[in-house]
Amino acid sequence: MGLAVKDAIQKGATQIEIMLGGTGTSDGGKGFLESLNYDFMTGRSYLDTLASPVTLLGLTDVTNPYHGPQGFAAVFGPQKGGSLSQIEETDQIASNFAKKVFYQKTIDLQTIPGSGAAGGLGGAIVLLGGTLTSGFSRIAELLNLDNSLQSCDLVITGEGCLDTQSQSGKVPVAIARMAKKYQVPTIALCGSVKIETGLAAEDFLAVFSIQQQPISLEAAIDKTTTLSNIKILAANLMLLIAQFNK
């Protein structure tokens, strides 16, 4: 990703917006920093050598800090297959690095919401002089979503797995809360639901898993199976909605 950013800069980009989420790594942004020639001793990078400033904006849907129980290693490490010992070691390295950064730049990564987003890429963007903002809010602004919702009768959204992390700014909950301002109900269709009914009811009219029967994860994420399950659930929902709109 750092190489892509560098290429964009060399082609004349002056503002780069990076969407953070769904990464395949959880390295605290180390690879990203290295590809932009970040010097871990001085805190300087490729961006510091540019004649004209470049604005980096990180769009994130979570507010995790850089390290600790809610940091990138502890929360996202298991998703990447990290063992307990690897996660503990990575979190300790992240903690030490954050202390060094504070000493170098008086930047406290631990107090910046989203610095642990995308395996720590949020923190890396901050170290390069960038800022973090709500990914949903930015996309909603570009799409003029707030205005569009005012003329809706019902919102249907989705999530691979609806869980407690979803309540930390992820799209399904964020759009449900925006729709709620205009008394527009929201239904969520999910691959799996791992949130208590009471918590889900705070934001959604209803939450449904698309699965039709007991199924393995491998089978559940098969594209053909997923499309079939969504079609079946969507058809049943439309029948239900039509019945109440007679």
Task: Give short role names for the model-derived ranges.
Residues M1-K246:
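N-terminal loops that bind phosphate or other acidic moieties
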